[in-house]
């Protein structure tokens, strides 16, 4: 299940990153303005690409934190307390 969550986070992070990069691109200069419909009634929001950029960076930061936490949890069971040559003491209740 952790692998599927990791894959999902990577896909979401990459798609957000791609969307933010594509949102900043200028339209092609070769396009004929007469072929485009008149969208003068629409008001583009200038803050929308900034929102996507923040969202993408948050997703990437969360993915990196998740990976680092899972790596640290996976290696913590290998740490030994005391001398490795000693037998572990048995705990009785």
Swiss-Prot record:
It is found in: Secreted. Residues 1-23 form the signal peptide. Residues 22-47 are annotated as: Disordered. Pfam families: DUF4576. InterPro entries: DUF4576 (IPR027950). One of its GO terms (cellular component) is extracellular region. Keywords: Secreted, Signal. Residues 33-42 have a biased composition (Basic and acidic residues). Its main location: secreted. It comes from the Eukaryota. The keyword Secreted applies. The keyword DNA-binding does not apply. Transmembrane segments: none annotated. This is Uncharacterized protein C5orf46 homolog.
């Amino acid at each position: 299940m952790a692998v599927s969550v990791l894959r999902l986070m990577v896909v979401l992070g990459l798609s957000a990153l791609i969307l933010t990069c594509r949102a900043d691109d200028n339209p092609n200069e070769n396009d004929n303005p007469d072929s485009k419909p008149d969208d003068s009634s629409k008001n583009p929001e200038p803050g929308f690409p900034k929102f996507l950029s923040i969202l993408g960076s948050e997703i990437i930061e969360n993915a990196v934190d998740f990976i680092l936490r899972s790596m640290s949890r996976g290696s913590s069971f290998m740490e030994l307390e005391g001398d490795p040559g000693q037998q572990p003491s048995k705990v009785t209740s």
